[in-house]
Each structure stands twice: as structure tokens, then as C-alpha cells.
Amino acid sequence: MGDDLKKSGKTKFFGFSCHDGNVVELMNKAAKVGGIDAIMFRYNFRQYGDVQLNQAIDACKAAGIGLIAMKTQASVPDDLEKVVGFTSKNFTLGQAKLKSVWADERIDAAVSGMNNVQLVQENCSAAASPMQLSMNEFTQLNRLAALTASSHCKGCNHICESKINGKIRIGDAMRYLMY
């Protein structure tokens, strides 16, 4: 599809974003079909151990598809994050979350919501810093992921929606509230 649109002159680049539980399926299909220039998908410190996602990322990179990480903060309520007590001499928790995404060389760009000047400054500072995360900081992010997993939406709508007979599209409602 993407190749046809490019050949017809209707577009120079073709890509898509995906949120739901079919991210791996869509990425694998894009790698096989071709004609896709970029995919924006949920990627953050909570998903690093996901073997299927990592294989899909590898397939996309091998196919020359640019990968854009979104939902990089993988936030949960602040009080839960404070309980974990992330500590670093070099980075705030938000900066560490971004640095962890940027540490993956397969990721070409990252989207990070910034609703105030302080966040813009923090993100720019993290981007400009040549310092990498330490193993201790990665370990703290893994601990944060484990301890707050039950309070973070993983986008697996089929689980939540099946509990209410699928009559309410929970994932769509959550995205509506977010955006």
C-alpha cells in the first residue's frame, strides 16, 4: 500500500502508529509487506523484556523501517512512583525514562509529552547530556516497572473488556481521556 501511494505521487512517506494489543502483529506485518517508512508505537522501560516485541523491532529495523517510541514515560500515579524512590546523581526519573529509550539504538526518535517549560528544559538537558544510564539506574527502572505493573495500562484491551462482556471499549475511553 505504501509503495503504491508513493509511486502515484500521493505521498512521499508512509507510516502508522499503533496503541492496542496488536502492536507486535502490526509491526511484523509491516516488515513483511514493505512500503512502510516509519512506525510509532508504545515503547518504554516496561517492555524491554518482551521477546516478541523485540523480535518485531528487529524485523522492522532489518526492513529499513524507522521506529518512533511513544508513551516513553509509562506513567502511573505520582504517589506510586515516589514509593519506589528512584535516585540518581545525574537524572530525574523522567530523564532516566527517556535515556532508557534512547539507549536502544534501534529507536530512531521518541515522543515525549511536555506540558510545561520545566519538562521541556529537563528533556532537552537529558538529550544534550552525553552521560548514559548506569546499571543501577536501569535496575531501578526495572524495579519501578515491577512494583507498579498493576497500576499501569498495558494496552491489552481484550483482558479488561472481557470482564465486562466487551460492552465498553475501555482502551478507547482511556485514550480519549488522555488526549
Question: Which residue stretches match the model-derived regions?
Answer:
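Glycine/proline-rich, positively charged
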Residues: 1-81, 88-89, 103
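Structured C-terminal cap/extension of enzyme domains
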Residues: 55-179
